[in-house]
Amino acid sequence: MAKIHMVLQGKGGVGKSAIAAIIAQYKMDKGQTPLCIDTDPVNATFEGYKALNVRRLNIMAGDEINSRNFDTLVELIAPTKDDVVIDNGASSFVPLSHYLISNQVPALLQEMGHELVIHTVVTGGQALLDTVSGFAQLASQFPAEALFVVWLNPYWGPIEHEGKSFEQMKAYTANKARVSSIIQIPALKEETYGRDFSDMLQERLTFDQALADESLTIMTRQRLKIVRRGLFEQLDAAAVL
């Protein structure tokens, strides 16, 4: 049985591709060879990670899902023994969610012996309410066969609204039973950890590539090592990974 990790969120620029890359690297760190697929019709950021051998597959035709291309995606997933990591774009969020639900894809994957794990991201700052709403939409609409992992990304500010943390918000408390794990991306000090991590993401480098790059200072690599450990330890604790 393989786990199909799908990153879904209707807001653009909130770290979806970075999360897909972290999941794929975590799998590789465990000796697995995940099948990585980028379906973002606008920004193929995930595909930019050459070390992850990401396959590009455009599943959109205008504003609609191209059902033939989606069929190709299912055919790729069906026989796999390896876990799959799929990055999806913000522009395909609504049609893809609708297509997955109306065609009962989560149940189909379960019949194949696979498990659908939806990773969604909630971010601080201006996009907080949009991303919280995106999570609530997914959790309330997807059937029980789909599992959920919520990533909290504080890059643009703390994840709190009217004094409430994410775990205290109605969107979470109403859907708590659907959430298997919450992954907290650390709030990184901007001039050190934050800059190092940002630079690595901009360059589409994996942690392994960055740590092997002798042009980076020893302390930069040390900080990246600490960030990786913090993320991977949380993924170790997430039962659905």
Curated annotation (Swiss-Prot):
Annotated InterPro entries: CobQ/CobB/MinD/ParA_Nub-bd_dom, P-loop_NTPase
Name by which UniProt lists this protein: Protein TraL
Family membership noted in the UniProt record: To plasmid R751 TraL.
Residue pairs linked by disulfide bridges in the UniProt entry: none
Pfam families tied to this protein: CbiA
GN (gene name): traL
Keywords: Conjugation, Plasmid
Top-level lineage group: Bacteria
Gene3D superfamilies, alphabetized: P-loop containing nucleotide triphosphate hydrolases (3.40.50.300)
Organism name: Escherichia coli
